[in-house]
Amino acid sequence: MTIGTSSVAVAPDFRFARPLELTLFALCVAQAVFLLASFADGLWLMAPDGSGKDTDFVNVWAAGQLVRDGHPAAAFDWTLHKAAQNAALGRAFESYYPWFYPPPFLLVASVLAAVPYAPAFAAWLAITLPAYAFTIRAIIGHRLGFLLACAFPGVVMNALPGQNGYVTAALMGGALHLMERRPALAGALIGLLTYKPHFGLLFPLVLAASGRWRVFASATLVTMLMAALSYAAFGAETWEAFIRSLSVVSKVALTQESHFRKIHSVFALVRALGGGEGLAWTLHGTVMAATVVYVCLLWCSRAPFELKAAALAAGALLITPYIYIYDLVILAVPMAFLVRVGRTGGFLPGEVAGLAAASLLILSFLGFPAPWGLAATAIVAALIIRRVHVTPAIAPIS
């Protein structure tokens, strides 16, 4: 099989213009002002009565407190975990934020719970946002990468609930950025990514298909070490509770109609439009299979590594049926690799506009909640495929 090429001209010697820099800076300031205004109105970090704001972060902090109290398995018990969330904020509230993470992430939660809720929330973002921003800057290879990273609308989408999208993006982007030069370290980052295993499904397939066994071995070793450490720290009971919770994850996230417009996957889109579960799984499975085949074949070709990395990162978002708006900060990773390619060889006509459109789709979720993230990911994936097919010297895949 051959991934073909064509001769579409690219704009030579692209330079980031001053107006673009100012625009990105303005977007960064706008997001910061939005968060500060939300804080002042009692919509972020702190509620109007001075208690902690109930967002996704209370899930992590409460689970960490249960660990510190000597009851790690209770994080998977909805009744006990909900009581811990109420205690964390000092008041009862209607929503519940369930704990679905593997036991190793309880180690992180327990550290965060060592300080009060609101400072822990702020510290979590203060640590993870720079990790994400430095990763995007490293991928792009230019100081403007910081502005691009922080101007991306996925930043505010992750900051509002205090979620872990920055961590996932930093681990995935860091692994791909280091894979050619530091395979063992890249594998270690992939191993750490198993704290959200549904975003790492493509990695073992791609690594095996392309014969990157050193990365594969490192990722496997770190995954096993994390599992062993959490087993030693929390015992078999916690792992058993986690395994039992897996069936609840699919039942809650993928069968309740109220969730469909919040999830940015092919499965959720079909269900939101009224399609049956069988049709939704069929279409999602088709997209998943096509993505896996294309990305694996691409990684076996002589395509530029930046395009391989971009395809894997975008593919990771397409194949999971379970992806929320805060996870879409990960989309900055494939976008960063495309920007890197554009910086060195010029951007294709419409490429910058496509990246901007994908960003605006994610931002639109604030005003009109819908699966815009899927459309944004599809745009970026299309830009990557276009790049692959116009880039010269891609060897046939046998």
Model region roles, listed by residue range:
Residues T2-L185, L207-P334, V339-V341, A393-S398:
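Primarily membrane-embedded glycan-assembly and transfer machineries that use lipid-linked glycans
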Residues A11, L192, A280, A382-L383:
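General helical secondary-structure elements
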Residues A184-A208, L312-I319, A357-I362:
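Membrane-interface alpha helices of multi-pass inner-membrane proteins
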Residues Y195-H198, L225-S230, E351-A353:
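Membrane-embedded alpha-helical segments of transport systems
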Residues V339-S398:
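Aromatic-enriched
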